[in-house]
């Protein structure tokens, strides 16, 4: 709480509040369902021991009997890194997931990994489960072991850039500044898409990086994804009505 650790994706739920819940199962989400994003698998591969150690610490803190790492079976290198340390942490196991969308959604992930169903609008803790993002766990590690607050963010910069890459940047820097770290754009009049192509939003080059910014997709303004996001709700409702 003192170091400002929140969920590093989604709604940015304060992490300390999850640590007060007595979950019997904790789940690490390493199932990036959005195309092109590689942030979590890369971070977990590079810092496997630190993140697993933190996950085990949380397991003991909340009194969970089981700690599950939900990871797509296609993340071979990351799985190899995890298997180097898994025996050091009793009660922790890997659950390999298929490469389907939207596996990274926590409700879907909970069902696939545990068989439990979270009701519509409900919270995972109602089913005795607490879910943690990979980068969130790494931030907890840095807060506990190194006493460092969250002042930076890992961001995947992909699509129409010179060198697609995952970078670590200070919170508050602009999207344009982050894209420059990937060598700049390769299209005229680029559109900055914050997040993945399925659930992301159109941003502005001057928008700041926040604690929940996971990715920046640079797309041409006439890309089908951009055009769909620019449709008004009335157009979408008309399409829905015609389909019905």
Show where each model-derived region lies.
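Electropositive phosphate-/nucleotide-binding environments in soluble metabolic enzymes
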Residues: 42-52, 76, 131-134, 169, ...
């Amino acid at each position: 709480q003192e170091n400002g650790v929140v969920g590093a994706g989604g709604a940015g739920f304060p992490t300390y509040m999850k640590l007060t819940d007595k979950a019997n199962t904790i789940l690490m989400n390493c199932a990036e369902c959005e195309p092109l994003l590689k942030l979590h698998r890369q971070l977990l591969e590079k810092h496997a021991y630190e993140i697993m150690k933190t996950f085990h610490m949380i397991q003991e803190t909340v009194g969970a009997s089981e700690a599950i790492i939900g990871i797509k079976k296609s993340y071979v290198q990351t799985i190899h890194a995890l298997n180097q340390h898994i025996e050091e942490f009793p009660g922790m196991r890997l659950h390999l997931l298929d490469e389907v969308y939207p596996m990274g959604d926590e409700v879907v992930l909970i069902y696939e990994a545990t068989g439990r169903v979270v009701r519509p609008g409900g919270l995972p803790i109602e089913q005795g489960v607490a879910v943690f993002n990979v980068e969130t766990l790494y931030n907890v590690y840095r807060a506990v072991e190194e006493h460092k607050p969250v002042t930076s963010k890992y961001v995947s910069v992909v699509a129409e850039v010179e060198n697609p890459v995952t970078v670590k940047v200070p919170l508050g820097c602009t999207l344009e500044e982050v894209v420059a770290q990937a060598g700049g754009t390769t299209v005229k009049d680029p559109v900055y898409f914050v997040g993945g192509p399925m659930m992301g939003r159109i941003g502005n080059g001057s928008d700041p990086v926040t604690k929940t910014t996971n990715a920046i997709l640079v797309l041409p303004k006439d890309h089908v994804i951009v055009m769909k996001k620019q449709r008004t709700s009335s157009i979408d409702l008309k399409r829905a009505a015609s389909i019905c």
